[in-house]
Amino acid sequence: MVKSVNEEGAETAYAYDENGNGYGGGNNDVATAIALGQRATQYGMKVCIDFHYSDFWADPKKQFVPKAWQGMNIEEKADALYNYTLDSLTQILEAGVNVGMVQIGNEINNGMSGETDVANVRKLLTAGSKAVRKAAADSGKDILVAVHYTNIDDMKKLDTLLTGLQVKEIDYDIVGLSFYPYWHGTMDDLKNAIIHIRDTYDKKVYVAENAYCYTAEDGDGTSNSVEGTGDLAEGYSASVQGQANEVRDVCAAANEAGAEGIFYWEGTWIPVGPADADNSAIWEKYGSGWA
């Protein structure tokens, strides 16, 4: 997979790292991140490390505190986050992974690692940023610090969050935006969001996540994220060609707006059917459908 996308022009691979004991749905620990990162580095690619700071992958609806950090106050949690980030990133760098960027949190519009108070989230971001800067300095590498948001359809809230980072002088380099047209708007909305953030906050921007379905059929006996024609983005069918058109248009829109690039997420997360009784029982435990 890595070799194939590199041959087609991909420059950066996206490896995410969940800490602690997972709930299923795939567990990307440090060892896995190293293995994937080494594979990408082998083909001349840079790697983006995405810290979710959770035992389960994080998004606006799920920002669970790791079980190992439960009961900590914000100062203790910030220290734990700093140490975890520094230790993990140091291991990854020492393993020879060509890290070009680190996301400190994943889709943090509504909170991060169990914290919903914006002041506490900023403390965690500061701790994560300091850890990345330390690891970068120790390794002699130039590594971008990224903050990752989604829901560009609510730019008012996104502006509030980014203004808070600016006022409190949070140290970061680049803003990542998730963009799925069936949830977040049109290509013009994406372009406008990128241009607005670049001009208003003087930060680089990239599309941290994008994907589109090539079929609306159920492949694993559980519900799909996007189901039926009513859920699809206008102008893009649930087909191989529709998927290709959407990805090309997102790339074009991002480039036109001055974005640094785009990550397709998640290109290998496909059903492995059939959805029989034996497989379904395993998927229910490990999350190979509902996650």
Q: Where are the regions that the model predicts?
A:
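Hydrophobic faces of well-ordered beta-strands that scaffold small-molecule active sites
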Residues: 1-3, 47-51, 100-104, 145-147, ...
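N-terminal substrate-binding region of glycoside hydrolase catalytic domains
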Residues: 1-42, 46, 52-80, 176, ...
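Active-site beta-loop-alpha junctions enriched in small/polar residues
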Residues: 5, 52-56, 104-109, 148-153, ...
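Short acidic/His/Gly/Ser-rich catalytic and metal-binding motifs that mark active-site loops
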Residues: 9, 55-64, 110-113, 214-221, ...
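Short, glycine/acidic-rich beta->alpha junctions
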Residues: 28-32, 189, 242-246
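Active-site cleft segment of glycoside hydrolase catalytic domains centered on the general acid/base Glu
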Residues: 30-31, 59-166, 170-172, 185-194, ...
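Glycoside hydrolase catalytic-domain groove-lining segments
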Residues: 134-144, 159-231, 248-260
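Aromatic-rich peripheral "rim/lid" segments of glycoside hydrolase catalytic domains that contact
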Residues: 192, 196, 215-228, 232, ...
